[in-house]
Amino acid sequence: MLNGLKIQAEKLGYDITFINTCFENRKMSYYEHCRYRNFEGVVIVCANFDDPDVTELMNSEIPVVTIDYVHHNCTAVTSNNIQGMEDLVKYIYSQGHRKIAYIHGQEGSSVTRDRLASFYRTIDELGLEIPDTYVRSADYLETKGSAKQTKELLNLEDPPTCIIYPDDTSLIGGRNVIIEMGLRIPRDISVAGYDGTMISQLLYPKLTTIR
């Protein structure tokens, strides 16, 4: 998606500058930084939309487009998270899995709400009974939380046979734990991600991920 954004922006004569929202010890807010750099517009993707600095930027006079988040003052581009999750769960089911766990992103996010609702609706349609311990929360685009939740899932008395992650970065955190525990993918445990980023296709074995 970011590559597509860059290509289209360059066709229109714009340059793209990336700002890492995980950068600590910032001396300026995002809004101040954008004003200082004279940005003509901002696209916000994979950010913590509860961050006051992000909210300040969205409420400013600078044109802002949000990805997979709806804010009253911004143009929003959203993916079909409901259909995507349904397709992913049904594919996992078709591979023979009946014990499917889901590590979802932050509570309160519209993306999380859509995906979680679709997950529950789809497993109901398939006649599956998923225990509450199989559904857990971890931050988007972060490996530590997904690693912790993966370890807890695999240490359950009746662990899942497949774990869905909220994005490919989180999936890598889970994958690392699986390897550390001496398990093999997909022989001992299957995993699935969300995003279809290039990195997920560079790993071996190739990871199941939805675009």
Which residues does each PLM region occupy?
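Central regulatory/effector-binding core of bacterial HTH transcription factors
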Residues: 3-50
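Bacterial carbohydrate/catabolite-sensing allosteric modules
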Residues: 3-14, 41, 58-66, 70-211
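Glycine-rich nucleotide phosphate-binding loop and flanking beta-alpha elements
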Residues: 49-51, 170-171
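Active-site-adjacent beta->alpha loops and helix N-cap segments on the catalytic face
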Residues: 50-59
